From Swiss-Prot:
GO terms for biological process: negative regulation of DNA-templated transcription. GO terms for molecular function: DNA binding. It comes from the Bacteria. HAMAP family: HrcA. InterPro entries: GAF-like_dom_sf, HrcA, HrcA_C, WH-like_DNA-bd_sf, WH_DNA-bd_sf, WHTH_transcript_rep_HrcA_IDD. The keyword Repressor applies. The keyword Repressor applies. This is Heat-inducible transcription repressor HrcA.
């Protein structure tokens, strides 16, 4: 929605959304006039609230005369109205100190990021470990075990090692296996899975019919392993902060608590958002009905990638659409910058979200 609003309507919409975020109660015109000392009458504010409702930014509950924001209202607020306030200097120092105390322990980074995000944003948090954005083949070895059995050792660009036993159609010597591995390494080194699929297709089209059977068999297993790795990137999600989100009034009903626990534990719906964050720069905000999964349409997610180059991860917060967006965005932005700096300093990875570039 791109409707231009008058300055007065922008102010009233901003105040109405801020008030609802703070109180969780529908917002009435007389409250806005009294609390924010507006130089207009409650009747005038009431008319403006009605106009904003007609435009789709607000709605009202049948049991109350007050208004509440719609997803479109929250979107307009995030993009045009909210105050962008960074975390305080004290908070930044504390967070940075906590991370540098555990900077040599990657697993502790992930746990700490989840805990700090949840506490700072007062919502649940999600974090994925830093990984290659997409699996690339670094090296392949084939090791003879028995005449018709071999071990495939697959090394990916980020150092991940996959091993799998192959049952061969015919007996093979170590020399023959090594030649096959060398051929694949020459053609597929540093290649993503899409390129290896092309090589497999080309090999199958060669003479004799089906090409080199061993090469095709190995390439097929490589493709499957790399697809599994890429899928794992989107599903390896650490979550924290359930206790924080349960303090929100939206979770007074058991059924809603159950749905949130399922979202955090299964990772299926959240996993669909990870590729979007990995391929985007800056902080991404997905609000309510903008989600493709129905079970996510009562929630908002604030995400950012961290790291840089080939090695990146994603972190963010999830909560009800009545989220303190400025606070959540500031927390996600700052912590992603801290983790990018850690990756850059400790592993020689140039961070995309550096602290010195934060606005």
């Amino acid at each position: 929605m791109t409707t231009d609003l008058t300055d007065r309507r922008r102010l009233i919409l901003k105040l109405a959304i801020q008030e609802f975020i703070e109180s969780s109660q529908p917002v009435a015109s007389d409250l806005l006039v009294r609390k924010y000392r507006l130089n207009v009458s409650p009747a005038t504010v009431r008319n403006e609230l009605a106009a904003l409702e007609e435009l789709g930014y607000l709605t009202h509950l049948h049991t109350s005369a007050g208004r509440v924001p719609t997803d479109a209202g929250y979107r307009y607020f995030v993009e045009n109205l909210m105050d962008r306030t960074p975390l305080s200097a004290t908070e930044q120092r504390t967070i940075r100190h906590q991370f540098y105390q555990v900077r040599s322990e990657l697993d502790q980074w992930i746990q700490l990021a989840g805990a700090v995000l949840a506490r700072t944003a007062q919502n649940a948090s999600v974090v994925t470990p830093p990984r290659a954005q997409q699996a690339r083949l670094k090296h392949l070895e084939l090791i003879a075990i028995h005449e018709t059995t071999a071990l495939m050792v697959l090394v990916l660009h980020d150092g991940t090692i996959r091993q799998q036993t192959l049952t061969l159609d015919v007996a093979m010597t170590q020399e023959e296996l090594s030649r096959c591995a060398a051929q694949i390494n020459e053609r597929c080194c540093d290649a993503p899975v899409e390129r290896i699929e092309e090589v497999l297709k080309q090999e199958r089209a060669q003479e004799p019919p089906g090409g080199n059977a061993l090469v095709c068999q190995v390439l097929d297993l490589v493709v499957k392993a790399m697809h599994q790795f890429n899928e794992h990137i989107s599903s390896d999600i650490h979550s924290d902060g359930l206790i924080e989100i349960l303090n929100q009034p939206e979770f007074s009903r058991v059924e809603r608590v159950r749905r949130m626990v399922e979202i955090l534990q299964s990772g299926r719906a959240l996993g669909t958002l990870i590729p979007r964050a990995l391929s985007s720069s800056g902080v991404q905000v997905v609000i309510g009905g903008e989600h493709s999964y129905d079970e996510m349409r009562e929630y908002s997610v604030v995400l950012s990638r961290y790291g840089g180059g080939e090695i990146v991860g994603v972190l963010g917060v999830i909560g009800p659409t009545r989220m303190a967006y400025p606070r959540a965005i500031s927390a996600v932005r700052y912590i992603s910058a801290v983790m990018s700096d850690l990756l850059a300093e400790l592993y020689g990875i140039e961070g995309a979200n550096r602290l010195n570039s934060e606005p």
